[in-house]
Structures are given as structure tokens and as C-alpha cells.
Amino acid sequence: MSLASDKKDADVASTTTTAQDDDNLSTYHGFDHHVQDQVRQLARTLTQQSSLHQKKEHTLPEEGINPIFTNTEADDYNPRLDPTSDEFSSAEWVQNMSNISNSDPDYYKPYSLGCYWKDLVATGESADIEYQANFLNGPYKGLKTVYNTVVPSTASSKDKNFKILKSMEGAVNPGELLVVLGRPGSGCTTLLKSISSNTHGFNIAKESTISYSGMTPNDIRKHFRGEVVYNAEADIHLPHLTVYQTLLTVARLKTPQNRLKGIDRETYARHLTEVAMATFGLSHTRNTKVGNDLVRGVSGGERKRVSIAEVSICGSKFQCWDNATRGLDSATALEFIRALKVQASISNAAATVAIYQCSQDAYDLFDKVCVLYDGYQIYFGPAGKAKEYFQKMGYVSPERQTTADFLTAVTSPSERIINQDYINRGIFVPQTPKEMWEYWRASEDHADLIKEIDSKLSDNYDANLAEIKDAHVARQSKRARPSSPYTVSYGMQIKYLLIRNFWRIKQSSGVTLFMVIGNSSMAFILGSMFYKVMKHNTTSTFYFRGAAMFFAVLFNAFSSLLEIFSLFEARPITEKHRTYSLYHPSADAFASILSEVPAKLITAVCFNIIYYFLVNFRRNGGVFFFYFLINIVAVFAMSHLFRCVGSVSKTLSAAMVPASMLLLGLSMYSGFAIPRTKILGWSKWIWYINPLAYLFESLMINEFHDRKFPCSQYIPSGSVYNNVPADSRICSSVGAIRGNDYVLGDDFLRESYSYLHKHKWRGFGIGLAYVIFFLVLYLILCEYNEGAKQKGEILVFPQNIVRRMKKERKLKNVSSDNDVEIGDVSDISDKKILADSSDESEESGANIGLSQSEAIFHWRNLCYDVQIKKETRRILNNVDGWVKPGTLTALMGASGAGKTTLLDCLAERVTMGVITGEVSVDGKQRDDSFARSIGYCQQQDLHLKTSTVRESLRFSAYLRQPADVSIEEKNQYVEDVIKILEMEQYADAVVGVPGEGLNVEQRKRLTIGVELAAKPKLLVFLDEPTSGLDSQTAWSICQLMKKLANHGQAILCTIHQPSAILMQEFDRLLFLQRGGKTVYFGDLGDGCKTMIDYFESHGSHKCPPDANPAEWMLEVVGAAPGSHANQDYHEVWRNSDEYQKVQEELEWMSNELPKKNTNNSETVHKEFATGVLYQCKLVSLRLFQQYWRSPDYLWSKFFLTIFNNIFIGFTFFKADRSLQGLQNQMLAVFMFTVIFNPLLQQYLPSFVQQRDLYEARERPSRTFSWKAFIVSQILVEIPWNILAGTVAFVIYYYAIGFYSNASVAHQLHERGALFWLFSCAFYVYIGSLALFCISFNQVAEAAANMASLMFTLSLSFCGVLVTPNGMPRFWIFMYRVSPLTYLIDGMLSTGVANVAIKCSNYELLRFSPAANLTCGEYLGPYLQTVKTGYIVDPSATDTCELCPYSHTNDFLSSVSSKYSRRWRNWGIFICYIAFNYIAGIFLYWLARVPKKSGKLAKK
């Protein structure tokens, strides 16, 4: 079977199919790159199922033959069974496999599965209306949600729950196809999920019965999950895998034990993959990446085929397809359904398909149909009887309306036609969902259905159940548990997933290479930073040795932090494959870990070898390998920990908060920043549970044990003390013993950290235990954590609007048209709403002053050329046309004909290539104001999710209507637009995101509304306004366009194969064939008669009276799949009388229209309607409102700020003025900056969302300039960062105790104010660097990596880890250019300066004075030389106690910090912020502002 003929397929040339047998019946040969040819073959071959069986009996032996051929020259070779042959026929292959299975039932164990349900009721939590969370109510709303989850509600279950599906019944027997029809929101998706046992997010009532030929949904979920499969709309795949790799993995995981005799597992899997690719037209894409929205790969249509091929390989007996034909035209959708029919007939499988736009030919293939209306089942039965059933009910089917469209139109009050005869005769016609449901339940068809279901449910299925179980066990591999739903064993799952993961790594090897090179570079940079101070193995290296070791363990441990990103990419795929019973999620998790081991080892080897030897750690083989072993344990322990965090989090942003908190806690309590002996009592437990603490301890013992470090500095020192006895001076290092000229490493560790050598291997053992513990925990979480549950669509309103609506008692009448929120609406209110809406639609637009187009827009000989691989390709070829006020013009053509390209050229939206020809407005060239004088409704509905409908419309009106129009007039005009678009019910609803906000139709109306609110004076372009919509919504959008045209608006609209009824709404048609060539431009006429007459008069076959004129025309010109034109209709057009008339009209327009009087004022021709300052004001207000209504973003910013600063503040709580206290205060300032990464990563996605919306919609329509966009981003972010900086200051400054230093120095106010300025400046700096990095980067991850690198380098060279005096001369420039140098210097000096130091008892150096001297006399010369330090008791003669420092300013000098530079430092840091913002603005202009527009080339 084939799927959509997409843009890639469109370029494939078709060849004529010839009959290949005596029955003049062409055989279906599968799919290779000639997709269209094959579509036609399949369509012609499989129309009659009996013919198919007849054909098979003539060509295949009853017992079947082995289809895996090793020799194509052998006598038994059948090319129709060989997927690599051009003659391959998938239908014959399926029949052959069925024959083989039936020939040996004891081995292959064939079986079948049907599905029967009775009294099926689905319920969801009542939430049809929500108030919008904002910065103030966000925490309350979140706590209320948690409370409601934890504490059972006292409300009745009726209040809490509502029925999504009301009581319904159904039966799908083996070999049958069921189509489910209904408008969006009717419950189609919920029904499919219910009968496929995928009920996340809603509940099935206890009284409901669902039977799968005797099995319960619980049996399916636990033991036979793979037999019942639900295929969702979205096509989610691993983007970097090729099509072949994606499908081969599925085939390997589904290869049965009872496969073809004599064929090994791998050969069978490869054959199955080849068959699937040949069947679905994917053979030519085998080595192409599947891709996604960001990764370039196969086309959208081909990706849809990959999804279908996956399900096909799974071989499920009951398949549920949710809108699987979305985005496919009717011809290719037909082929998909035909192939489903063949599969059902031959393999005895059953399928249920929910479909939105269903052609008559497709409908006729279904055995049964189920019609849903707002959760009510209003018909279930034979597809052939449904139309008659509703006609009997009292509804009329218009001429040329398909049966499927008629059945869904019955559920739409605005579209259904009630039989006038019934009304005249007073016969009751059911109209509300409940009335139709009651009519259905009283009908004979319902009674027949109940009889069928009861007979099926009462059947004895014991034999059938045993058959299914035997078949399942026979398919399972040897080591698989019989009760397991999976086909292959756990070990084989890991093996195949490991292969898949290695493919992924190979396909994206650039990432691994970047990590290796990046980490190696960091090893060189960091290692060389310590090179000078670690050159000599003396006591002077003690601090730096600890710092370097701390850096090593942190860098290795946190190198796995970014693994969280990849977890979220793969999660939906794993969840999908779990429902297909391909593998355990834990098997995928374990394979993922194993596959990354080589990359981790290579990265660790490259980093650690370079770093270890450059830093000059201990040169000993055993010591090095122990160092490497400990760091490898750190890598895996943290990798598994971060994976655990990711697996319990619903979203990436939710995972980053705990990950950031862990990062801070683990690093601060590792033993370096604050030694274990100095940790405050209440927080010691953090050290005991911290794996990094034990690993750091082992590394330090490994480095220092059994070493003598020569003393680098003695106290006292100087020429006066050269001849004093050894016990009269001491080494200045901790651990020194009086009289020794060295310090033992073990003594230093014991005194400084309380580390003992006997604990060396303890760290390794505990680290390994953590690795195993986190691994097991991660696998358990992956296996049993269901991930984010899907929500139904709900309308969201701002809280003040909700209050007002409650007062007006409107809430019960407001409902979003969707699947999971339509609750029980009383019959009366339902009728009232129907009546109200019909009254409003009658009145709406009667007296509305919509903008009327006055000018005629016309183009002549329009050509568009682009360079592709050094060749010039013509996309549009001499296209002519016009759009007049009050007309609705359709633009049609096959995929790849250039429809959207023509719109973009006419609207000046192309940024590459060369456009030639004439494009004129009333005979004059387009001016700068043209882009804002038109409305352009894109195919994607792009809106700001936090705005309401009314706010979105007003924003467009304020900025795009002329500045001289008053605000009152603009507001009134917006109200007019709301009325004509019939959006009054949800005018104050928040746009939201799909699922929580407006539904598809409402979004499409808003898209049109935003363009109308701009009051376009020329015309409105609409690109595919009906794509992805059901036929009823498409109809309502088309009616809306007609209404606009009737109000004098000029409209040009591209449309993809409209229905006959839709087609009749248009006035004119411009039809393009492939290559951008015109085939027809002219009136359509009543019932498209003018257009039909044109083609019939120029040699086409007659249009059948019941045919869709659009499909007939596509077939005539050879644009439908498999069709061929009997002549070149472009040449026919160029030689026709109609073409000459078009040329004459265009000539008249060019000559006469310029004579019209037009407004030539300067404001009319400006690029933007309003000034830059006004734009900045409005855009900033909107952005501020967005921030206010995004509590997740703001509260995570403040939560992180509060947590980080409380954590740091209470770790170093009220640090004293001892040496350790000063060290702690310096490290506290250093740790203050680690919030940089988490805050930056939160901001970047927010900016990217804003920018994408601006560049896709607001910039092309000239709503506001790029200057207003970028300046508003800066202006709105700064106040929130200042607020966060203020919160940080209040917590941090007082907790650490900086205020007490200022108080003692009598500088409380100045130093407090300056510290607050530094704190705010740092938070603003984070925002400025984020803007600088993202301004020119396309994706947030790239900007985050760049900013993280810059921050790491700034932090490394800021002077804390290594003082500038200790750095190699080469790196001094880095110290000077690092912005954190000035921040930390300023904060530290402001925090601790001008106070006396008081050493703790253990920090005092003790030694004996020279004979007959007091300590004061003995140390006097030394203290005068060093100018710091104090003696505890100068008069002592026995033991001198000396504190090395006497004043905090002396300590500051030792770390190159000075209090006198405090204001200079703040000023320099502010300059860095200004530089970041200015550079960000410049880089945005340089990289992302278009320097040319799609203007016409000068001739």
C-alpha cells in the first residue's frame, strides 16, 4: 500500500501501467521509487477482493513457498515474492505467508482476534473551564492541585467526573474494517484508546464490558499487549536512524521463534524489513535518516509510511488507527485503506480507523461504521446502511456529498439539512446528541447489534483463548517468560537495542567527537592554569592540589548532566514501542547506558590523562590508575543519578530544577569547599550520603599518602632567623611539626580534612555501591513510570474573566470543541446553545464595517528561479492572474506545483532566488507598505500562547492599522471582527497550547482574525486553511471566507483537493501544474460548470455527474496519483481563447488602473504603520504580560534563587572572622555564581519561542520592527532579574554574615547597598549573556553550550582557584578579561574588608621562641617585615602562638582583592552587561535580520 504522494514523490515521473494478464487486471507489485505508478496499480488491482483471491489461486501453491531466495536463477524463484525485485507483489506475499501458515497449523499456530464492547462509558476529571495561572495565583493553583490529588474530595463523583463517552456498543469481527466518524471533540480518539486498552488520562466505567475474543483488557495489558495496537496521529521516531535501521530494529524484536523453517533469526528479520519497505514505497529511502522537525530526513509523507510500516511489521491482530490519513490527499488515503482491507481479508486481522476527510471510494471499503456526536454513539452498523438510516431519521444528503461527509454533517447544526417534508408532516426529527442517541437505542439496528454482541460475549472462548496463548508462546524466544507480552527475551531486547543505540551514536558521531575534543581542550586549559603553582612538590601546592583534585572530580562527575536532554528525546518513542510490545522500557534504559560506555571511557581517558600530567599530580603508575578508577566511578554514579532525576520528571524544565539543586549540594559538600570537620551540625548528613565526598576523600588520600612535602615557607622567616634552632620556627602549612623541614601528606590530610589512609578503598566501594543502586533505581523507574499523561483540551480564561463569567452564570455554556472535555450538557441548554449560535450566525455580519478592498491586485508573466546545486531551476513559469475586491479565488495544483511559492512571491516573502515579471496594485509597483496592506494566513497557526483571543486581535490592530486611527475605533473594529468570525463565546479565552487552550478550528479562526484586525486594504492570502481539519470544520472555514468576500474583501486561497461542495464556494480558480505552469485561470461558474466546459471543450473526457470536479480536473491534467494527461494542458491553455482574454484584461489593467485617484500621503507608504517607540511600548507590555502569565518560568527562577541562596547561606551560616571563616566567605562568593547555568537554561527556550513567533508571523507582516522585538526582550527581562537579585541579596548577605563585618567597620549602609548592586548586576548579567549567545544561534542547546563554556572559563580564571600570581603568564589575560574577576573581587572585598581577624585555636602556629626572648621580642622583626599577623601572648616565653593574618584586608591582598577597587569593579561589571546587550543586538541584526526582500528583479 502507499501513503501520501508528498513533495518528494511529486517529482517522480509516472509511467503508464499496462495489463499483465488475460483478465486485463494489473497486478500490485509493491512500492519502489515509482510510487505513483504503483498507487495506480494497487488501485486497479485490489478493487474486487474476489478477483484478488482468484488471481492468487492461479499463481501460488496452496502450501505456499519459502519467499527468502538465495539464488535468483533457481527454478523455484518467484520475483513476485522477492521484495528486492521490481515485480514484487505485497498482496501475493501476504497470501503466500497465509498459505504457509495454514499448511502446518501445529507449527505456525494461526489464530484470530475480534473486539466486542457493551455499555462502554469513559469518564474524565471535570475541567471544562480553567482560570489561567499567573505570577500571583500560580503557587496557590499548584498547591491546590497537589492538595486535590493527595486529599480525596468530598464532592460527589458526579461533580468530579464527567462522561467523555456515553454508553455505547460495538463489534468488530476478525477480517472486518470499522470506520469511526465524528467531528473533532466527538470522542473518536477516546473510543479508539478505550477499545485498544490505552486509557491513560481517563477511566473506563466498572460496568463497561470489553472483550477481545474472550480476553479482558487486563489480559491484553499484562500478557498480550502487542496483539492490540493503537497508532496515534503523531509520527515520532529516532531522527538520526535511517528508515532501514528503524524498521530492522522492530523486525528483530518481533521475529518469532516459529518463523519459516530453516531460516535464521537475522535473515528473517532482514527479509521482513525489505518486505515492509517495498510494500510502503520506502525502498528508495532505506539509507535516509527518518528525521523530524529539526533534523533533516525523509519527507512528512514518507515519515507517515514509516509509522505504518512499524505497525505492519508488528503483525497485530487488532489495530486502531487514529486519523492515520491526516495530511494525505484522498487518492493516497484510499490506497492505505485498500491495503488494510487486503490484510484483514487474508490474515483474518481486524482494524478500526478514525478518519476526518473520507472519500466515497474509501468509505465503500469499510464493513462497518460508527458515528459519534459529542460523546454519544448515534449509529453503529453496516457501512452500506448508514446513509439510509439517517435519511429515515429525517436528514437530506445534498447532491455530490460523500456518505462520510453526510454522516458527520448530521452532527453539525449549521450544516445538516432537515427534510422539509418531515417538518411539514410534523414528524419529530432528533437534533441534539441525546435525542439522536435515544433514537438509535430504540432502533432495530441497535437491537440487532446487541444480539450480535450478546451472542459473541456468550460464546465459549476457552478453546480460542488456549489457541491464542499457544500461538503467543510458540512465537516467543526460548528464554522469554510465557506470561510476558514480549516476543524476544530480556537479553535479546538489550542486544538489539544496543545495536540500535550504536547506530544512533554513529549517525550523530559529531556530538561524541565534540565532547571528546571539548573535554580535551578543557583539560589543557584547566591543567595549564595549575601548571605554574604545581610545578614544585612543596607545601605551597597543598591548597592548589586540593582545588585541582576537586575540579577533576567535579568535571568528571558532572560531564553526564546533559544526558537528561537525550532522555526526553527518546521517552515518547520508548512509550510507543512499549505499547507495541517491542521491549521493556528498562531494557532500553540499560542498553542506552551500555551504548554510552565507550564514549564515556574515551572522553574520560582524554580528559584525565592530559589533566593529570599537566597539573603534575603524583607521578606513579598505581596512583594514576587509582585516580582514573575513582573518576570513572564518579562518572557512572552521577550519570545514573541524573538519569533517575530525568526519569521521574515530566518535562525537561522540571528535571533541570532538581538537577541544579543536586549539582550545588553535591559539589559544596564534597569536602573541599567546606571540610567535614567544619560542616555545621544540622547539615552533616548531606556529607554522609554524598557519593562525591567519599570519592574526593579517596583521591586526596591517593595523592597525599606516604609523601613528604618540603616546606616552602617558614614562620618566622628572614635573615634574622637563619640560625635559630629548628624548634623555634615552624612550616606555615597545616600539619607541620615543630622542628621538621617537611610536612607529611598524611598529617596534612588528617589535620585539614580528617582523612585517614585506611579509608582509601572505602570511597571506591561506596562509589561502586552508588553506581549499582542508582542503576537499579533507574531501571525500576523507567519500567514503571508512565511518563506525562495526555490531557484533554480545555478552554482557559484569565482569572478576572472567570470571576465575571461566574457572576453572569455563563460557565455552563462555555465548552471547547474537543475529545476529553465535553461533559454532560442538559438537553435544554444544548438546544439553547444551538439556537443561540444559529441566531447569531444569521445576524453576524449584517451591519459590520469590515475593511473593503478597493484596489485590484494583478500579476503578469511571473517567474521564480532558484539555484539548486549550481543549476537554475524554474519554480514558477509565466503565471498570470488577478484578484478583485469581493471575490474568492482558489489556487490549486498537485504537490510541488508551486502554490505556496506563488503566494510567497506575491506577498514579498521569499528571501532567496530571482523573481521576474510584473506584480502590481492598480497598475503600480508594490511599495514599502505593501506587506502590512495585505493579510497572510499561514498554514501553521502561530500565536502567543499567553494572550487571549481579544488581546491577540487588538495587538494586531494597534500596530498594523494606521497610527492616526484612534484606539477606540481600533477596539470597535476588533469587536466587529470577533462578531463576523463568531468568536464571541471564547473571545476572552487564552490561546494556550494544543490540549490546554483553543482547539484546531478556533486557532484557525484566530489566525484569520489577526489578519483581518490589521484591516488589510488590498487582499487576504490564505495558505491551506483547511489542511488537517475535518470536512465540517473545513466547510465552516470556507463559509467564513465566502462571508468575507461578500463584505468586499479580496481573497486568494490555496486549497488541496477540496470536496465538490467546498469547490462550489469559490468564484475563480488558478490551477498550476508541476513546474509552476498555468493550466487554467478563470471563473468556476455554477457547480463549476464554466471550468468543466473549458476542459471538456479542449479534449478531456466527460465529467460524471456524481464526480467531484476538483478530483476530476486533477485526473484530467495528470496531477492525481497514477493518472496521465492525454495532452500538455499548459500548452492548451496558452493557445486558448480564454488565455487571450486574460492577457487583454491584464493589458487594460496595466494601462487604465494607474489613472485612478489614490492616496499619496507619506504615511500610507511607510513600512510600518506605527513608530518604533510606540512599537517598543506595546511589545514590551505584551511581553511583560506574557512573563506575568508564565508562572512556571518566573517561579522556577525565584525558587532556584531562593533555594540556592538558602543552601549556600546556611552551609556557611554566620561565617566568623577566622582564617577558615574567611576561606568560607570567599568560597561562598564563588558558589554564589553557580546559579548561572540553571537560570540561563530556563531563559533560552522562552526567548526562542518569542523569536520563532516574531520571525514566522510578525516580521513578514510588518507588525513591528526587529528593533522593537530585541529591545523589548531586554527591557522586560531586566526588572525580573533585579527582583531575583534582590531576593538573593536578602537571603545570602545576612545568612553568610557579611552584614556583621560591615557593622563592625561602621559601613553598614554603603556596603549593604553596594553588595545589593553587585547581586542585582550578576542576575542581569546572566540575562545579558544569555541574549548575547542566543541572538544569533538557531537552537537553545547550542547557545547553552556556548554560554556554559564562557562561564566555566570566566569562573576558572577569576582568581579564586588560582591567584593571578600563580597563573602562567600566558593566562594572565584571561584573568583580566573574565567578568567574574571584577564581580568576585568586588563582592568579596565589600563583604569582608576592614575587620580584624581572630584565628581559631587550631589555626594558630605554635613554636618556641629563641632562648631568653619573649614571643613579642622574638617575632617582632618578622611581623614588621610581613606587616600582618598577631601574637596571642607577646609576653610568653615558653610557646609562641601566632596567627598569620591580623586584618581581613591582608587576607584580601593574598587573593589579589582590594576594597579600594570596589566601585571600579562594579562599574566594569556593568560595562560587561552593556557590551553583552549591544553585541547581542548587533549579532541579531547581522545573523537574522533579512538584508533583502522578495522584490522583483530589475529587468
Swiss-Prot record:
Gene3D superfamilies xref list: P-loop containing nucleotide triphosphate hydrolases
Please give the residue ranges the record annotates as the region Disordered: 1-29
Modification sites for Phosphoserine? 307, 484
Q: Which residues does ATP bind? A: 893-900
Q: Where is it localised? A: Cell membrane
For this UniProt record, give its keywords in alphabetical order, as a comma-separated list: ATP-binding, Cell membrane, Glycoprotein, Membrane, Nucleotide-binding, Phosphoprotein, Repeat, Transmembrane, Transmembrane helix, Transport
Which stretches are transmembrane? 510-530, 548-568, 597-617, 622-642, 654-674, 763-783, 1193-1213, 1228-1248, 1278-1298, 1314-1334, 1342-1362, 1466-1486
- Give the knockout phenotype: Leads to susceptibility to the antifungal azole derivatives in azole-resistant clinical isolates. Suppresses the development of high-frequency azole resistance (HFAR) in a medium containing fluconazole.
Q: Which GO terms describe its molecular function?
A: ABC-type xenobiotic transporter activity; ATP binding; ATP hydrolysis activity; identical protein binding
Stated name of the protein: Pleiotropic ABC efflux transporter of multiple drugs CDR1
| Gene name in the database record | CDR1
